[in-house]
Amino acid sequence: MSFNNILSFGTLNPDFIYFIDELPNLGGDIRSYKYLIRAGGTATNCAENIANWGLNVGVAGNSIGSDEFGEYMIKHFENSNINYENIIFENHDTPTCSIYVDKNGERTIISSGYNFCKWNNLKEVKNFDSLIVDRYSIPFIKQDLESVSHDVFITQAGYQEEITYKINFLVVSKDEIDVIEANRLINEEYVDWILLTSSNLPARLISKDGVLEITPPDFKTINSTGAGDATAAYIGAFGVENLIENVKGACASGAIVAGTNELPTMEKIKEVSELIEIKPR
């Protein structure tokens, strides 16, 4: 089962992605052997995957400018069948991200231009039954989250601000949160499920029922950019009614993005899901 109307809330910006062997020492030159430009930001990445799965999804988050980069983002939403009616347009430069991907697929991000942005008020965005929020937007919507209807399934991608509000599912890298903090969030009932992910180690699903270890397929990571977003997008799209299968699908989505740098199709997700092992830890 999927949700009927999904809102992907968070960062909206063009990405400039540079593939390099490694970052130089301070003061050195960065030489890239390949680059690409794409519509990015967590809200965009999640919505792009969900729309690709044929589901109804919209975006909201930071304002964008009426400049060339803003036009580029809108054109992408139109071409991807993503609802953008809630986006705020302001007289400022559209924020951007420069992403440096090393030979191991790990990324270093420079984000710019968010200081001038306004953010959507969640109270003004209605008629969604599933909400995906990213860690960067939390400072601007923290109070709004506390008033979101309990009928809305909330997925958070990433962890930065302390969680003092109720969410259903947290998808987070092991680098962003430790197990002690994850267990606290579960025990104090701020979060129902936490999926701790890693690019090269087994993932963990933590809940009040215990811990499950998830062994992903042996994919070589070529670009981890957007892999966590694809994982969160799957949970935000399909929820936890069929928990084990949906967690497998979420992990498969992330693995496909990291290993191929392509949008995961439902057919490919099903194929890769069969290679994922889940067992009690």
Regions found by a protein language model. Name each.
Residues 1-60, 261:
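Glycine-rich phosphate/adenosyl-contacting loop at the front of the ribokinase-like
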